[in-house]
Amino acid sequence: MAEQVVEILVSGGKATAGPPLGPAIGPLGVNIMQVVQKINNMTKDYEGMSVPVKVIVDTDKRTFEVEVGIPPASALIKKEIGIEKGSQEPKHQVAGNITMEQIVKIAKMKQDAMLAYNLKNASKEVVGTCVSVGISVEGMTPSEAQKAIDAGQFDSYFN
């Protein structure tokens, strides 16, 4: 069985037969429109976000499987607080504020893909991502929020 794996980032629910998908899948001998349709059905819940997708093609049988990953934490943060873009100057300009409840929700979604061994540390990773997006956490800078997590201020969210 000759298996080819194509990994791409697509906009949730809006994959097309054009680049980057079409040129990567076309030569493998499967119906591109079927692949696009399956990807769009599987990613429609992530509309407006970049979603990692893995297309596994069996070139002998001309069949395919689609595996959808979880969008990057930055995309989940922006969707959760309802903004399209983060701050242009993340350390100087705040693009929005996120609650610890929302942080924990994102951490639970991403936990399997993270190196953190518990929800508290996974949440700290998500808070760390807030630095690069320019988002405050409960009105604090992300570094202040991480110190507050370490101090136990938000422990009620992790039980």
From Swiss-Prot:
GO terms for molecular function: large ribosomal subunit rRNA binding; structural constituent of ribosome. It comes from the Archaea. Pfam families: Ribosomal_L11, Ribosomal_L11_N. One of its GO terms (cellular component) is large ribosomal subunit. Transmembrane segments: none annotated. One of its GO terms (biological process) is translation. The keyword RNA-binding applies. Part of the ribosomal stalk of the 50S ribosomal subunit. Interacts with L10 and the large rRNA to form the base of the stalk. L10 forms an elongated spine to which L12 dimers bind in a sequential fashion forming a multimeric L10(L12)X complex. PANTHER family: 60S RIBOSOMAL PROTEIN L12, LARGE RIBOSOMAL SUBUNIT PROTEIN UL11M. This is Large ribosomal subunit protein uL11.
